[in-house]
Structures are given as C-alpha cells and as structure tokens.
Amino acid sequence: MFTYLVTQAGLASHFEINSAATSREEIGNPPHYGTVDKLHREHIPLIPHHARQMTAEDYRYYDYLIGMDTANIRNMTRITGGSDKEQKIFKLLTFSGSGRDVADPWYTGDFDATFADVMAGCSGLLEKIRREENI
C-alpha cells in the first residue's frame, strides 16, 4: 500500500520500497487471499511478491524499517543485532499518532480494519518523509 501511495503522489523515483518477513513462517508465500481480495475491492494494484526473510543487511541498507506489531519490532531488533542505534525501526501506527499494533487479520478475520490501519500508517509515514525530505 505504501508503494501505491508513493506512486499516486508521483514520488516513485524518490523511494526504494521492499517487504520482508520477521519470521520464517511465510517465507516464499504470496500475500493472503483476504489481503488480495481487499486490495482488489479498493482498486489498489497488487505488486506480485513472495515473502523473504529480513536480514541484518536490511538495517544497513534502508532508512526505515517498519513493523506491524510489537512482535515484529522485537524480531526486527533481534535480526539487526539487538539494538536500533540509528533509530530506523518503527511500528507502522506510530505514524498515525496511535502507536498501537495493526489489527492482524490472521486472528481477527477483519481485513477492513487492517486495511484502515495500514492506510493510516502508510499515509502518515509518507507525510513524515515528504516533510523531512522536502519532496
């Protein structure tokens, strides 16, 4: 969804966006069918991808590492060596002013709530970057 927002804003040339899992459970899997369905209903194009494992190199390479929930943040910190010295690791909803965990549709079955959470967080993140980078 962040890629979609960046593209809609005409800012794709300013970003390199990637996605990675913090656990091995979903490695190699495509997005969940419920996610795919919700994106189609919202007319947001799906970018084909399969889950890959986050690595310590991601911390060195990317400016922002965004997790959906507290468990993601804990796993990301572990993967990157146990600390976040450069303050690159964030919970997505921090950018919406909430800081709570994204509602996980795996447990809730509520893809609409998750969509709203992710859209709010991604919109806030894009606003922050645009403001800080003057783009």
Predicted feature residues:
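Conserved active-site segments centered on acidic
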Residues: 1-61, 127-135
